[in-house]
Swiss-Prot record:
One of its GO terms (molecular function) is protein homodimerization activity. This is Oxygen-dependent coproporphyrinogen-III oxidase. It is found in: Cytoplasm. It comes from Escherichia fergusonii (strain ATCC 35469 / DSM 13698 / CCUG 18766 / IAM 14443 / JCM 21226 / LMG 7866 / NBRC 102419 / NCTC 12128 / CDC 0568-73). The gene is hemF. Substrate binds at S92, N108, V109, R110, G258, G259, R260. Keywords: Cytoplasm, Heme biosynthesis, Manganese, Metal-binding, Oxidoreductase, Porphyrin biosynthesis.
């Protein structure tokens, strides 16, 4: 079947609705929607939940942008895209909880297509989800990765190991020599064997995110914590900011190509702190995190 951008867009709009409903059901607070238009073509729906019962901030963004020509920064790496009109669409979300025992989570699914008359379209899917705990719980990490593995299995035995490895490699802070979190799945440039297969996989990843995340939220959201744990959470959120502003390709691409800054930076935590040469106390749960987030096989 030839690529159907309209079908993908409808799935993404429904996915945004569903995830917002699921997060509201856990939290009690409602999302505020900000619809926006892009002068050069397209627009989106940014939805933010702030200061809820469970989530300090949750942002779920849908965007669909299109244009007559790709920016030079994109065609430099992909000369085959020169002279083509394009559509790029996706849902991207980040959830920052109040409770330090509840991990931060991120998910993204996206579709890109570039066309010109008389030529086959160039298209691909990308996406994934990853988890950033502040305090490590093995049962949470196992559940997260088991859910990821199980949704991949119908698409092949090698899919989960390949996309887990890619996730571990992508969410890595070179300047800190550490992982951002415990990973999950990351894929890009997916266009084989055919559109239907790739679209089905993207749908499985999009739907699988809440299956992976919400049971962990329910398990941890009522755990008691104090100022000590909160301070550590805010310190570790600094790593999230560092990754997004220094290494994340999506953030950099969006900012360099005139994307909507408010939506791009919606992933930022509302509060964060840095501390010069911070060293956690030896043997403490905070010190244990550096070992916990090292790459390993969780399932």
């Amino acid at each position: 079947m030839k690529p159907d951008a309209h079908q993908v867009k409808q799935f993404l709009l429904n996915l945004q609705d569903t995830i917002c409903q699921q997060l509201t059901a856990v939290d009690g607070a409602e999302f505020v929607e900000d619809s926006w238009q892009r002068e050069a073509g397209g627009g989106g729906r940014s939805r933010v939940l702030r200061n809820g019962g469970v989530f300090e901030q949750a942002g779920v963004n849908f965007s669909h942008v299109h244009g007559e020509a790709m920016p030079a920064s994109a065609t430099a790496h992909r000369p085959e895209l020169a002279g083509r009109s394009f559509e790029a669409m996706g849902v991207s979300l980040v959830v920052h909880p109040h409770n330090p025992y509840v991990p931060t989570s991120h998910a993204n699914v996206r579709f890109f297509i570039a066309e010109k008359p008389g030529a086959e379209p160039v298209w691909w899917f990308g996406g994934g989800f990853d988890l950033t705990p502040f305090y490590g719980f093995e049962e949470d990490a196992i559940h997260w990765h088991r859910t990821a593995r199980d949704l991949c299995l119908p698409f092949g035995e090698d899919v989960y190991p390949r996309y887990k490895k890619w996730c571990d490699e992508y969410f890595y802070l070179k300047h800190r020599n550490e992982q951002r979190g415990i990973g999950g799945l990351f894929f890009d440039d997916l266009n084989t064997p055919d559109f239907d297969h790739c679209f089905a996989f993207m749908q499985a990843v999009g739907k699988g995110y809440t299956d992976a995340y919400l049971p962990i939220v329910e398990r941890r959201k009522a755990m008691e914590y104090g100022e000590h744990e909160r301070n550590f959470q805010l310190y570790r959120r600094g790593r999230y900011v560092e990754f997004n502003l220094v290494w994340d390709r999506g953030t950099l691409f969006g900012l360099q190509t005139g994307g909507r800054t408010e939506s791009i930076l919606m992933s930022m935590p509302p509060l964060v702190r840095w501390e010069y040469d911070y060293q956690p106390e030896a043997g403490s749960p905070e010190a244990a995190l550096s070992e916990f987030i090292k790459v390993r096989d969780w399932v």
